[in-house]
């Protein structure tokens, strides 16, 4: 959990440490920074599609592996060269990495999919296929997506595309029996 991470970071991190949290929690960096002021703690998010195939075996059914990270608005840009180096190192390993000036937009864009699909999937006890077709499941999903989109606009975030349409396109590419990690946990 996030709370369990704080004592560890307080013990090992210094002013020369760069932390890039990639949890599915919006604003993780700011939360950690309040308890751990010494290191530079960015915000980040990750897109990866993986699943447990068998005990000890994790597979990627589709090659989705993207990482976004960056400074929050108003955050001092300490260790910027190191953050750029992390981006380059990740790219050299084949990861689609982005050190961005718009991390809040990127993180909220991701959150606009994972949170609504997880919550609606649990609430309705449905898998991905139910959200692909017009009906109650898709309507609930899109309502939740648009709530997050509205929140983003209120925060001053301008999205490049309609998040509802974007997230329906994501669903099109998934198997009908797909579930989120929230549902599997």
Where are these regions (language model features)?
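Rossmann-fold dinucleotide-binding core
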Residues: 23-110, 116
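Short, conserved clusters of charged catalytic residues that mark active-site
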Residues: 4, 27, 181
């Amino acid at each position: 959990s996030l709370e369990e991470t704080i004592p560890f970071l307080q013990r090992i991190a210094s002013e020369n440490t760069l932390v890039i949290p990639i949890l599915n929690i919006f604003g993780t960096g700011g939360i950690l920074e309040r308890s751990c002021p010494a290191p530079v703690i960015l915000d980040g998010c990750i897109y990866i599609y993986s699943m447990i195939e068998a005990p000890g075996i994790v597979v990627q059914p589709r090659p989705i592996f993207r990482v976004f990270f960056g400074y929050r608005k108003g955050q001092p840009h300490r260790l910027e060269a190191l953050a750029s180096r992390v981006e380059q190192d990740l790219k050299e390993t084949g990861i689609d990495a982005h050190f961005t000036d718009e991390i809040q937009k990127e993180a909220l864009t991701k959150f606009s999919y994972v949170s609504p699909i997880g919550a609606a999937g649990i609430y309705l006890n449905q898998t991905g296929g139910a959200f692909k077709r017009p009906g109650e499941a898709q309507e609930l999903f899109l309502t939740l997506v648009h709530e997050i989109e509205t929140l983003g606009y209120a925060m001053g975030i301008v999205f490049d595309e309609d998040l509802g349409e974007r997230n329906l396109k994501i669903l099109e590419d998934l198997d009908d029996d797909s579930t989120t990690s929230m549902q599997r946990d």
